[in-house]
From Swiss-Prot:
Subcellular location: Secreted
PANTHER family per UniProt: EGG PEPTIDE SPERACT RECEPTOR, SCAVENGER RECEPTOR DOMAIN-CONTAINING
Documented EC number(s): 3.4.21.-
Organism: Pan troglodytes
Glycan-modified residues: 26, 683
Protein name: Neurotrypsin
Gene name per UniProt: PRSS12
Nucleotide-binding listed as a keyword: no
Compositional bias of kind Pro residues: 56-71
Alphabetized UniProt keyword annotations: Disulfide bond, Glycoprotein, Hydrolase, Kringle, Protease, Repeat, Secreted, Serine protease, Signal
Segments for region (Disordered): 29-88
Functional summary from the UniProt entry: Plays a role in neuronal plasticity and the proteolytic action may subserve structural reorganizations associated with learning and memory operations.
Amino acid sequence: MTLARFVLALMLGALPEVVGFDSVLNDSLHHSHRHSPPPGPHYPYYLPTQQRPPRTRPPPPLPRFPRPPRALPAQRPHALQAGHTPRPHPWGCPAGEPWVSVTDFGAPCLRWAEVPPFLERSPPASWAQLRGQRHNFCRSPDGAGRPWCFYGDARGKVDWGYCDCRHGSVRLRGGKNEFEGTVEVYASGVWGTVCSSHWDDSDASVICHQLQLGGKGIAKQTPFSGLGLIPIYWSNVRCRGDEENILLCEKDIWQGGVCPQKMAAAVTCSFSHGPTFPIIRLAGGSSVHEGRVELYHAGQWGTVCDDQWDDADAEVICRQLGLSGIAKAWHQAYFGEGSGPVMLDEVRCTGNELSIEQCPKSSWGEHNCGHKEDAGVSCTPLTDGVIRLAGGKGSHEGRLEVYYRGQWGTVCDDGWTELNTYVVCRQLGFKYGKQASANHFEESTGPIWLDDVSCSGKETRFLQCSRRQWGRHDCSHREDVSIACYPGGEGHRLSLGFPVRLVDGENKKEGRVEVFINGQWGTICDDGWTDKDAAVICRQLGYKGPARARTMAYFGEGKGPIHVDNVKCTGNERSLADCIKQDIGRHNCRHSEDAGVICDYFGKKASGNSNKESLSSVCGLRLLHRRQKRIIGGKNSLRGGWPWQVSLRLKSSHGDGRLLCGATLLSSCWVLTAAHCFKRYGNSTRSYAVRVGDYHTLVPEEFEEEIGVQQIVIHREYRPDRSDYDIALVRLQGPEEQCARFSSHVLPACLPLWRERPQKTASNCYITGWGDTGRAYSRTLQQAAIPLLPKRFCEERYKRRFTGRMLCAGNLHEHKRVDSCQGDSGGPLMCERPGESWVVYGVTSWGYGCGVKDSPGVYTKVSAFVPWIKSVTKL
């Protein structure tokens, strides 16, 4: 039965029995079972003011909502609204009803700042205006349709739905001012009241919090006789006092009977520290514990300017509102811009005051601010699982501490990842952050609460991450997690930023750029990728030094989606999100175009003079040797890890710098390679160039240099139809000892001793080059560990073709195949003398295919040619 039909039937006296209230509400107030109410006058839905006599004819038509008795003609309902002016808000629910955050079918709304780029279907127009808003209240951004919000459906997709804007809203009616009155609740299109049974100050405080009318509520009662015809919705409301709104309190659906003393619930919203303190409320937050600070002064509400606003000021605001927990200051209209006057400026509390009135500050109304500088606070309750950063210079940095069982404790850094840091900083209201060193902040003395934490990045709360049980760990306080969070824009405002990480670099300051979007890490296409884009990435990660862009999968190809293309940064943005001009996921790229960066880049070439003095007599040093990785069966080498590796390249009519062979730098002016490299194009010096300091063949690099060829010396015994004596020397153009400029990335290799047998002296051997990797020729320098094989095995495999001027190397098992292939011809086989330097024992020469089982690669044995090399080069 609809309400209109019910009222009409009531007026006509046609009801045989009275309908139960829950059948009208359709369980909209979390009441899922249904009743069949007994007949009779003891089960009223409306409480009449007096007994109605029998009617012989219908009365005149009545309005749908009865007016209050004549004794209250000047009194109006009171509810939260900007300045308490009863006008509709163009972006949301009617003024006074800002708390609706569920769809009309009960799905909880997502915060506007957490809506991903990919949606199940297109939402109503103009919603982009709400990007970055932290609340999840229903809104109508175009001002025309019904309010709506985004929600997550059962499949994990994001969809949107309309909201019943006033459902669950409350107001105060019949009081002397807006801070007192009878409590009325809105549901299913009707305002109703609450029976005062068990109504106490905790219940009243929730109403005051919901209406943002003060820090404390005093329970009152109002006779039903003065309310007119109005439904009763609830009885026995049982709030704890810290709920965000009355819908979250335990309560009983009214099922008829007698309400004790026939009294309705009412409240007076007061302030615990007396009338001399200004009235304060928090507005625009997602709960009663946070929001824009607003003061009631001279009959109107106004805001506070954030000049000198800090956590000490927030502490006083939280105390004055009766909100305990962690107090945090927010700046630059973090909770949205207010309206009305700016009441105060230059507030400078010590943190010990009982009220903002006791703090040093400007005079009322004196300021030089606009509403873009409105101050805010959050007062996070101390419940199990609350987190904070302690021991730093502010609430944005310090040891990560978790509150549990009345005590703060730390988190062990075992298995800690960037995603963990992202979840922590996001929960604290920051956009991104990074882990600080363990000794950056003072050690804690409390318990270690958590260990082995692992977050996926999708969590909205830290405790949603997988972890050990409380108190289970194998750590000391030297392993406490420390974090520095960074703002996401002006005033630490959280916006649509994306977590960023660098992958597959040689250290944490470089690598392939990956972004976390829609629950998945993906890469960035290098179309238009410049140093300005790199600067923004490095700034977002907290690095302040020079930044360099890298293209063409310089740090290897990524996996998963390519999230972003055509990034256009000016270099001044705070995060990647500010530079994205193209839809997420839209691109025309492959992973061979993945973008990378190097942060805090201070690379410099050594001068020619300093080289001659300090490095000319040194060979076989790897100045950047920090780690080993395991061409076919190989992996990317360490950049600068093989500084003697050079490449012989074609030029002029034969090709535009195409890679022909690998080679080894023996001195500033001499290079060692294979004789067969000149078999096809001849030995004209004009056809070739040598590139030193190269790592990625398609990306110009700081240490890279291309030098012309002055002389080519092929061993006189070499014959093109044979593989013996496959060795050659190349003289670079330039003055003696000043051809190639030495640096950390350009250094010579050592020659072996004459007739030295590397199988007995060398155990740690590597081949390097840009050759065949099984799919294609590599763009980045490869390296592979390779064992030297006994001479007799090579003689048995290759018969007379294998001579005493050769050696062979490689893994014999197919699943461990390591070999050098076409592109590595002429490149080095390097072995490390124990505790000494790296020696070029072989020059890649020939083999039966690439990585073929039981067919190891064959190398020219350099030790057999040492006298010839020295006679030509004068080394």
